[in-house]
Amino acid sequence: MASQKKQLFKIIILGDSGVGKTSLMNQYVNARFTQQYRATVGADFMAKEVMIDDRMVTLQIWDTAGQERFQSLGGAFYRGADCCVLVYDITNPKSFDSLDSWRDEFLMQGQPKDPEHFPFVVLGNKLDKATERKVQESKSQQWCKSHGNIQFFEVSAKDATNIEQAFQDIAKAAASQEKDEEIFFPTTVTLTKQDPKKQTKQGGCC
């Protein structure tokens, strides 16, 4: 059997409504930000090619609705994910307090093969509003440390601060899972048609 590394990684972005999940994805994929807010209905995704360890892979980034009425749809979107990104708003303490429930929901509905070692990344968004900060960076770092040393970045979807670096680490975290999930393809089998003239007749009953 020959093995081939994965070329596509599924990234799930979770967090309360209004924390900027769609804006983060749009800034990373399209380098664009809009002030207009439109709540995501159900889920949506964008794709971007990125270089990881000298090879090109595609990140399929899923932006999911933060409203409770859509959370029952989570299982269908979460399964098969290679990394989960938890987002909160540094000016909104409630969105930070929700990180535990979002993490637990993903583990319950996404059912990753190895829950204890599944990669999460936490993003504290709206760093451009640092003067209105309500969640201290040290508090977020402590939360991440207590949940298995989760990677953490403070970012801004508006001015792109730390966006590229954060998603590069997200991509690497997703790729780290493929050691246990390599895709195997059988080696090529060549079929040779036998010349009928060279076939020997065999007696016997049907």
From Swiss-Prot:
Species assigned in the record: Paramecium octaurelia
Residues the record lists as Phosphotyrosine modifications: 78, 88
Regions that span the bilayer: none
Gene from which the chain derives: Rab7b
UniProt keyword list: Cytoplasm, Cytoskeleton, Glycoprotein, GTP-binding, Lipoprotein, Nucleotide-binding, Phosphoprotein, Prenylation
Name of the featured protein: Ras-related protein Rab-7b
Protein location: Cytoplasm, Cytoskeleton
NCBIfam families (alphabetical): small_GTP
Phosphoserine, modified sites: 17, 23, 72
Lipidation (S-geranylgeranyl cysteine): 205-206
Coiled coil stretches, renumbered: none
